[in-house]
């Protein structure tokens, strides 16, 4: 199972398109906010499941949607958020604490524009800013294999 994780595309549709073209096929795409409508302009594999949460810029532009959610993918529980509502810009403790409280295996978040791949419990994964060509891939087989990438 392959999960593509992006965040903070901020209207840079070309970079987002490059990321999707580079990875070609994936089972899920998670957008952790701030540019979720950018996905509308990009061809996504037909069978891919799209999961999005609204970031602070999305909300400022009047886009309605959840700011965090919990999803189970291949038996792993994902806490997905932009992170601003949990204070991620200054400290990731709020994101970590909420993911832990909810019993999640991994927290996927954005907002900081800084990539993070920390094997804590729960796992903390921030793909960085897609507007700069940064993204992440999570491969799930017997365990989580998280990788940060750049186009």
List each model region and its residues.
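Active-site neighborhood of phospho(di)ester-bond hydrolases with catalytic His/Asp-centered motifs
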Residues: 5-7, 28-34, 51-56, 79-82, ...
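N-terminal active-site segment of His-dependent metallophosphoesterases
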Residues: 1-47, 62-66, 140, 147-150
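Helix-adjacent hinge/juxtasegments
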Residues: 47-87
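Binuclear metal-dependent phosphoesterase catalytic core
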Residues: 2-3, 17, 72-74, 97-103, ...
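Mid-chain, well-packed structural core segment of small domains
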Residues: 73-107
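Short secondary-structure boundary/capping segments
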Residues: 42, 68-70, 99, 115-117
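Active-site environment of divalent metal-dependent phosphoester hydrolases
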Residues: 10-14, 36-40, 57-62, 86-91, ...
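Zn-dependent metallo-beta-lactamase
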Residues: 38-58, 123, 131-133, 146-147
């Amino acid at each position: 199972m392959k999960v593509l994780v992006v965040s903070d595309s901020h209207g840079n549709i070309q970079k987002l398109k490059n990321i999707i073209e580079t990875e070609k096929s994936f089972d899920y795409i998670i957008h952790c906010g701030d540019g979720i409508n950018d996905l509308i302009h990009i061809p996504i594999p037909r069978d891919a499941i799209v999961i999005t949460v609204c970031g602070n810029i999305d909300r400022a532009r009047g886009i309605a949607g959840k700011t965090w959610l919990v999803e189970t993918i291949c038996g792993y529980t994902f806490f997905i958020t932009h992170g601003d509502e949990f204070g991620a810009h200054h400290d990731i403790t709020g994101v970590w604490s909420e993911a832990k409280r909810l019993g999640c295996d991994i927290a996927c978040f954005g907002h900081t524009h800084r990539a993070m791949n920390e094997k804590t419990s729960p796992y903390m994964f921030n793909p960085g800013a897609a507007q700069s060509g940064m993204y992440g891939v999570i491969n799930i087989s017997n365990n989580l294999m998280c990788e940060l990438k750049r186009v």
